[in-house]
């Protein structure tokens, strides 16, 4: 199970996805923790058993136990936050924006890894889940930490996992 195995499953009509996945993951130039934490958290966020099954072992092999757990925690907490804050944002009754969230999010304050790495993973998951408020929030944390826009986008750029997940899941029903 690996990136190469996942790429081999992508059908010919989605060759662009195969090439993009290879360049985004295979040639990122990122430190292993940033890259593989993003790969793991976005594979989880893609909700595709195929993608997760193929990428998780390689991510686990390239991450410390703490980073592996933190990447999974980023996917978990952002799945909750993305739904809550996206709903709050989409409601036409803006009074909902004044209500307390009442959600436990302790892992955000103490993720067990470098805070910037955790925020990158959260940013990538929020992009997949389509939560603009969460994207803005994580972007602000990254900018305050001195991360430039280009660097932030590049480090959290695993959008290919979502496209591959959708394609392979559709192929499973063909």
From Swiss-Prot:
One example GO MF annotation: disulfide oxidoreductase activity
Record-stated family: Belongs to the AhpD family.
Cysteine pairings via disulfide bonds: 131-134
Pfam families named in the record: CMD
Species, as recorded: Streptomyces viridosporus
Known EC number: 1.11.1.28
GO BP terms, alphabetized: cell redox homeostasis; response to oxidative stress
Active-site residues per Swiss-Prot or TrEMBL entry: 131, 134
SUPFAM superfamilies recorded: AhpD-like
Name of the protein: Alkyl hydroperoxide reductase AhpD
Role description: Antioxidant protein with alkyl hydroperoxidase activity. Required for the reduction of the AhpC active site cysteine residues and for the regeneration of the AhpC enzyme activity.
Annotated Gene3D superfamilies: AhpD-like (1.20.1290.10)
Domain of life of the organism encoding this protein: Bacteria
Subunit structure and binding partners: Homotrimer.
Swiss-Prot/TrEMBL keywords: Antioxidant, Disulfide bond, Oxidoreductase, Peroxidase, Redox-active center
Catalytic activity reported: N(6)-[(R)-dihydrolipoyl]-L-lysyl-[lipoyl-carrier protein] + a hydroperoxide = N(6)-[(R)-lipoyl]-L-lysyl-[lipoyl-carrier protein] + an alcohol + H2O
PANTHER family: ALKYL HYDROPEROXIDE REDUCTASE AHPD (PTHR33930:SF7)
Sections of the chain in a coiled coil: none
């Amino acid at each position: 199970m690996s990136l190469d195995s996942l790429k081999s499953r992508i059908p010919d009509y989605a060759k662009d996805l195969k090439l993009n996945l290879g360049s985004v993951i295979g040639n990122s130039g990122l430190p292993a923790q940033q890259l593989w934490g993003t790969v793991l958290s976005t594979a989880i966020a893609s909700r595709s058993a195929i993608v997760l099954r193929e990428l998780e072992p390689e991510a686990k092999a390239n991450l410390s136990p703490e980073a592996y757990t933190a990447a999974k925690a980023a996917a978990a907490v952002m799945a909750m936050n993305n739904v809550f804050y996206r709903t709050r944002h989409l409601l036409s009754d803006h009074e909902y924006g004044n209500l307390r969230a009442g959600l436990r999010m302790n892992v955000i304050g103490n993720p067990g890894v470098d805070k910037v790495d955790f925020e990158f993973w959260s940013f990538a998951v929020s992009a997949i889940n389509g939560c603009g408020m969460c994207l803005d929030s994580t972007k602000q944390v990254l900018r305050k930490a001195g991360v430039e826009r280009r660097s932030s986008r590049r480090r959290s750029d695993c959008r290919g996992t979502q496209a591959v997940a959708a394609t392979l899941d559709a192929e499973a029903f063909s």
